[in-house]
């Protein structure tokens, strides 16, 4: 399955589970489809997702990760005051790390906007087992 087919499938499944999206028009251009998919991921309410959906989502995210590249810790420089602390300005989804502190607001919940870069089903679905 190519990237466009994965996006089409994922958008279709997200439309099926939300009646408010029934009449949503899906753009034809790949870049616009990707923006729509990101918005749908970010505004999806927590609920179970099918194994097939999660598998295709994971494949799609691996493709996107490969396109954008991964930044590893050994390519970064710590701050002089504490060698355990690294500051990063850029796309945090590219970092190969265990934890991120992003105190963007007083609730520490981050941004709840549809076009925020990362708020995927992996994060919001309480029933999905976490692999360590």
List each language-model region with its residue ranges:
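Short glycine-rich anion-binding loops that position phosphate/pyrophosphate groups of nucleotides
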Residues: 106-107
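Single conserved hydrophobic/aromatic residue that forms the stacking wall/gate
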Residues: 121-132
């Amino acid at each position: 399955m190519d990237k466009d087919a994965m996006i089409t499938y994922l958008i279709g499944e997200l439309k099926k589970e939300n009646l408010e999206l029934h009449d949503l028009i899906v753009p034809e251009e790949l870049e616009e489809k990707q923006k729509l998919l990101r918005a749908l991921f970010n505004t999806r309410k927590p609920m179970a997702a099918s194994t097939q959906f999660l598998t295709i989502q994971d494949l799609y995210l691996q493709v996107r990760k490969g396109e954008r590249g991964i930044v590893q810790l050994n390519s970064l420089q710590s701050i002089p005051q504490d060698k355990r602390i690294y500051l990063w300005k850029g796309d945090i989804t590219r970092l190969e790390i265990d934890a991120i502190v992003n105190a963007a607001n007083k609730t520490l919940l981050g941004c709840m906007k549809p076009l925020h870069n990362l708020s995927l089903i992996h994060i919001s679905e309480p029933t999905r087992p976490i692999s360590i």
